[in-house]
């Protein structure tokens, strides 16, 4: 069956958007709240009607992720900010493979995310309560699967518990996009042999996103 590179590109952009958020938080302690909201909200949509629905049914919501994806696909450097983003993205994809191999962990992940619905009746998605709950899911379910993702940035910034929680919640969102990517036919060979197709799709989607 022919691959749907549009949907595959959207899910990859979701992974890359999470990587971007992690990088911004780790270095500055801040990130764009709209971008973070799109990423965290994707975790909650476990039965989407489409790939785009995971990201709020709006390509514009993935603009940062698409730009980050293009940067990763077009870079050959193994140093600097681009290399850091690549490492986060590929680490998330590797962790998703470990998650897929452990059905009990997948079940626990779904159960814990489902339990958030009650809290969301009382707290905003970006509230400290919900972000901390998402971070706890990442620590309890994902961090136990294998080598932890090494987040690099400002040591002072990374000491902040709220920044730590946002970083972990963003990593959880990256895992969600990696799961989606695999479900719709994504695979690591595409990143080597279908880069041109992915770049083309990402550019076409970005061309439809209005400049802000």
From Swiss-Prot:
PANTHER family: HIGH FREQUENCY LYSOGENIZATION PROTEIN HFLD. It is a peripheral membrane protein. It is found in: Cytoplasm; Cell inner membrane. InterPro entries: HflD, HflD-like_sf. Keywords: Cell inner membrane, Cell membrane, Cytoplasm, Membrane. Belongs to the HflD family. Pfam families: DUF489. It comes from Pectobacterium carotovorum subsp. carotovorum (strain PC1). HAMAP family: HflD_protein (MF_00695). This is High frequency lysogenization protein HflD homolog. Signal peptide: none annotated. GO terms for cellular component: cytoplasm; plasma membrane.
